[in-house]
Amino acid sequence: MPLNKDIKRVLVIGSGPIVIGQAAEFDYSGTQACEALKSEGVEVVLINSNPATIMTDKEVADKVYLEPLTLEFIEKVIAKEKPDSLLAGMGGQTGLNLAVELHDAGILDKYNVKVIGTSIESIKEGEDRELFRDMMNRIGEPVIKSEIVTDLQAGIDFANKIGYPVIVRPAYTLGGSGGGIADDEEELRTILESGLQLSTIGQVLLEKSVKGWKEIEYEVMRDSYGNCITVCNMENIDPVGIHTGDSIVVAPSQTLSDKEYQMLRTASINIINAVGIEGGCNVQFSLNPNTFEYAVIEINPRVSRSSALASKATGYPIAKLAAKIALGYGLDEIKNAVTQKTYACFEPTLDYVVVKIPKWPFDKFFGADRQLGTKMMATGEIMAIGANFEQAFLKGIRSLEIGKYSLDHKKFKEHSMSELKDLVMKPDDERIFALAEMLRRDYMIERINKITGIDKFFLEKIKWIVEEEQRLKLSNIEDLDKEWLKNLKKKGFSDKAIADMLKVSPEDIYRLRDIWSIKPSYKMVDTCGGEFEALSPYYYSTYEQYDEVEVSNRRKVIVIGSGPIRIGQGIEFDYASVHCVKALKKLDIETIIVNNNPETVSTDFDISDKLYFEPLTEEDVLNIIEKENPYGVILQFGGQTAIKLANFLKEKNIKTLGTTADQIDMAEDREKFDELLERLDISRPKGKGIWSVEEGLEEAERLGFPVLVRPSYVIGGQGMEITHDEEELTFYLTNAFAKDKKNPILIDKYLMGREIEVDAISDGENILIPGIMEHLERAGVHSGDSVTMYPSQNVCDKIKGKILEYTKKLALAIGIKGMINIQFIEFEGSLYVIEVNPRASRTVPYISKVSGVPIVDIATQVMLGAKLNDLGYGVDIYKEPELISVKVPVFSTQKLPNVEVCLGPEMRSTGEVLGVGRTLKEALYKGFVGANMYPSKEKGKILATINKHNKAEFLPIAKDLAKVGYKFIATTGTCKLLRDEGIDAEEIRKIDEEKPNILDIVKNREVDLVVNTPTKGNDSKRDGFLIRRAAVERNLGVITALDTLRAIADVELEEFDKNKDLEVFDITK
């Protein structure tokens, strides 16, 4: 039981959907916290809207509510469950903001709920820019010259007084949202306007820019008795000016003198004591590289992205200990789980180097402004561990899955030196390659240091890597002797990088290593630099002498993880990997996980029997397989990252459990797949590959418009578009062939039907479909961006029978053992297959939770030989539940300048929320509220710009919205359409007409909701694009699919009292 006997039932608020700035790290920390509380005999009540998380599994907390994270719904949970305490710091910025709002609204007092861990007062002092600055002044900690402003003019006046550039930091926002660096008044106006709108209290800190100073972070722990330690200090390679979430970060710091290290450590402890933190806290400093001058940037009075990184870098479980501290324990009373001998008051010691590199989404968004600044844009990150900086850094580069194994990037070879200088002075996501190219051309390190602010230490290390690359390029394989190869491996060079430089194959380098016995050894992450014996089975590779892995004779399976979070491959795959590991453990199989993502539950050291924190490349994975000699390897749960290893493992005669490389090829090769469907007598939309605009127009005439067009080789719908007439098709094809003449464009008949999706399990004889999911938006919107309903609402028994028949035929014909995901279209009473994925999909966590079928557990048992009939869930289609569950996508496009908002065949969402209700409309209402898509009725104004193809469909929806009180603003054509039907509408001028025009009313937030159905293309100069961007940057709802608007109108027409009639549901029941 907890030290504080008054704590019996604790409410934990999760962080909600994955968005840029708040990703999987809060699933990791929230899961740790819930398990720590339960281990102390405390009952845990969890509210979180994100169904893709481990945290919302019914085993993690005693009561789990997948409900919107709003005061209205949290109060319902508090009223129903009557918790005595609230733990606020585990749900990121979302959880922290909600705790403050619950306090300020009097809800905590009303239900007698006390905040444990860091208090509301301490949260406010850490988050409110003015209170924090005043406190720093009181305790004598330096802050940068700054001013708190709540209006535009005050900000401009202050900037004029201190001079540009200035940094804008809004209060209570996430990942630097609404912030930035302004070099002049025009930039300041734009950033300030955004920052004031996005801050929950309308407050912004303006400070004199110290861009170019070092950015240093300390992760600190403190208990209620005042005991305080620093867990880890971290150094951003990128100086102040780039958000720490977009910076390459090294732990421990590499360039601080002992005096600087101790000075900032002392400051961190002074700050955490003054604020009164009880738990974990992240402190960020700027440090003048030429003097001992420093300033406090900010603190995060909660677990954070940096604390997840610090936990994985050190093996010190910050979130778990923060939860125990909240229960009243002191650091000197909590045992270190890694050593089982020392206590949590011992500061961790690192005898290795950790490098974190962000993963950006720009491969999905070609038009995005890639320049990095104080607003975070990365969706995820990788972490690499090495015996030295070079090794960790090169491991990190190849972990990013961008096709790069070295710092040699062809793109930058064509750039002039002045272009390269511009690139490193205005850094983007590829700046490290531009910097390497400058060093390759012998540009002086001192000058690069001066123009970038990157420390000479790191530049010298990168210079050494570049010089070795050049030396290899000028050599041949006969020049590569044993000592040189061994040194290259010690410094992190992969076989592929060495082979590419020598113009041989990686297999040639592997053979040399084999002959010379140059094999990796594996070291343990033990928190204590080897001072005490560690029990944690947490390893990284080096090429040092001693190996710390003990290989057992048990039957063992290696599970390949999914790597960094990105659009199209998110936290859902980590969920699947973790459940696979748990299922294997139940079967008494030794489980080994390989992954490189510091944010996730899968890389918690006590999830698997062994954790290898390594890149997910062919060489790094093969090294581990050769070390461990497993019974088999599971790829099905690691998304495309794991699946793309299938052919390589087949070539090496390594057994993959479940679906094989040949079966994957059958599903993914268009020609083979078409032949399979024909053989099975299964329909798919008609289409073919075309090589010219003329051929495309002929094929479209044969098929009939609309048609779906896309490049040949795409992932996640990249480059797909629906065209409605010859003009649109010609526009698309002309641009597509201008970019790529070597590959055909695929053109298919676009069926504007109902999209249906299933995740199924096959044992080779039977299949089990846990549930049939129906998409709200018609085909043409990527499945990951669609609102998804379960049970399906409009699928008749005849079609359900066809779905079962087709799924069984496909699974058995392909030879699936484990999971298969199939997407269908129902069109005019017929069923068509549009896609088959022979692996786990992103809907697995959702359908597992809402159907009650432990899909991954069953699939894992099937891979190892079990039969579905023996596993207790039957075969064919599982019975449907009474409650209706709706999955609603969540987008982060606000964080990505110049990125298209419009829904289409290419996936854009970063996360999702769940809405659960007794009726579809209740579930939709909760889902829309949770995703922040539901319009507020205070103004009740909808801006509507509808293209010619959608006007007839829009009218009845507009009538229903007008009926419940919404007012419309529209440009001439749409306005006339509405008035002709008797709907009151206000006319507004187009963008190219005099002010105030349509763009002005969006920028001034004079509307509640923007409904914009796009015309052709994604041209950033088009009016529709500019309107959508302006709306999303001002946090206004944007709807581009009329099916979504129809659903909102249906919910509005419903007569239930949204405050009184809506129940909250505990999914553990």
UniProtKB/Swiss-Prot annotation:
PROSITE patterns: ATP_GRASP (PS50975), CPSASE_1 (PS00866), CPSASE_2 (PS00867), MGS (PS51855). SMART domains: CPSase_L_D3, MGS. Mn(2+) 1 binds at residues 284, 298. This is Carbamoyl phosphate synthase large chain. Residues 402-549 are annotated as: Oligomerization domain. It comes from Clostridium botulinum (strain Alaska E43 / Type E3). Mg(2+) 1 binds at residues 284, 298. It is an enzyme of class 6 (ligase). Residues 932-1069 form the MGS-like domain.
